[in-house]
Amino acid sequence: MSDVSGRFVVAAAVVAVSLAMAAAAAAHDYGEALSKSLLYFEAQRSGRLPYNQRVRWRGHSGLTDGLEQGVDLVGGYYDAGDHVKFGLPMAFTVTMLSWSVLEYGEEIAAAGELGHALHAIKWGTDYFIKAHTHPNVLWTQVGDGDSDHYCWQRPEDMTTSRHAYKVDAENPGSEVAAETAAAMAAASIVFRRAGDAHYAHLLLHHAQQLFEFGDKYRGRYDESVEVVKNYYPSSSGYKDELLWAALWLHRATGRREYLDYAVDNADDFGGTGWAVSEFSWDIKYAGLQVLASKLLVEEKHLSSQQREVLEKYRSKAEYYVCSCMGRNPGGAAHNAGRTPAGLLFIRPWNNLQYVSNAAFLLTVYSDVLSYLSLPLLCPDPDAAADEAAPAAADAGEVLEFARSQADYILGTNPMATSYLVGYGEAYPRRVHHRAASSASYARDRDFIGCLQGFDSWYSAAAENPHDLVGAVVGGPNGNDVFTDHRGAYMQTEACTYNTAPMVGVFSRLMELERRRRGEDAPPSSTSPVAEDDL
């Protein structure tokens, strides 16, 4: 059974795991965190803002994007605290938002946030439809990172280059084509479930074309669009994105050809070979390994070969989970780093992106373990082939670890600081973000020049005029220390792909808390959202 015939229903075993975690549950308001996370995406919007825009200190921006190239590229998201629209991280953001809704849509609906979640996804997919102007053409970037970083302006005042860049048959970009295909395929399932069959079909049509384009004309996108190399280079190549997109297309269509692609190319493309400790906009292996593992739960008519290969994917998914939890034999070489207070620590620059992605994958994988009634296994690579690996953790422990990472983000940390802006009493007040750090365009329309903003806003010791509510910033250093200063951009800049996976995590934990308190599910509606509202 594929996602075509219905969503993956969390089994009774998952409920039992949730109840068993009652004693360890934290006193955080995950519903509030969820609501604020979704609000953040409205602050990152580019283009003509809708009448129901909730972040009122933002205005229309980028209204001539694509004009120079004769294509309409108005819309989409700014990735972080600047104003370039980077296609690869934007697509990954939409994929993770969609996956969050697919896994925990009922919980999101119960919180009254399903409409906002669909809006957030559609703001991205509407842009991707515009950017995919031909079966073998995808516009992947608007703006220039170098000139953009030279200025500190509100997006409404931009004077920097809005040159647009594309990939095509002569200048391929398999990573961005495949990731955009994955995003549109995942979103198509979301909107089909929401009752918008026409829009779902349109997204799926684009997703299939983009996958075919990325697979037929293979090449690294940062070699075709070289200006992206200083910002979003591809370190893992494009094979992980191709496998990732194929699995999403299988879930969206139920067609065997996409599953066969992921099975037949599993070894050659590294899907069953790469054992990793990170999941990000660049390196998709852990994500596709968890996604493949879910097929063992959802698919009822797998061939023996398919099941064998999917089990290989699952073994690598377990390596990732074991690495995050520090359970892999072999010490530091096989396990993700930690701060003294227990936060996963992969890199100093924007470390919380890796934490939020890990929290999401571990949350999803704990549900897989519950359904299969299996423990987490962390085998010793030096053990004999016939030596069974001991159980390293159960599903409840995996979910508990994911919760610990979410709670750290929400303020259970040595700094007693929430790294989700706007949550709690103490949170970053000087986020590295041009719009949030400047006067509201809605109240003060006096033009802010390119360099003027550095003197007036960037260098100021004062707090930002606007809280970037719902943003997950880069986070503390390896010693759990955080510096709340705009110049400390490795720690204070937030990105869309930091927050996107937390939508799913907060939704799952919100439901966990409800069960802990023994409450009935609140009345909710998963009925279709009116097309006019989207």
Curated annotation (Swiss-Prot):
It catalyses: Endohydrolysis of (1->4)-beta-D-glucosidic linkages in cellulose, lichenin and cereal beta-D-glucans. Residues 1-27 form the signal peptide. Residues 515-534 are annotated as: Disordered. Pfam families: Glyco_hydro_9 (PF00759). The keyword Hydrolase applies. InterPro entries: 6-hairpin_glycosidase_sf, 6hp_glycosidase-like_sf, Glyco_hydro_9, Glyco_hydro_9_His_AS. This is Endoglucanase 5. It comes from Oryza sativa subsp. japonica (Rice).
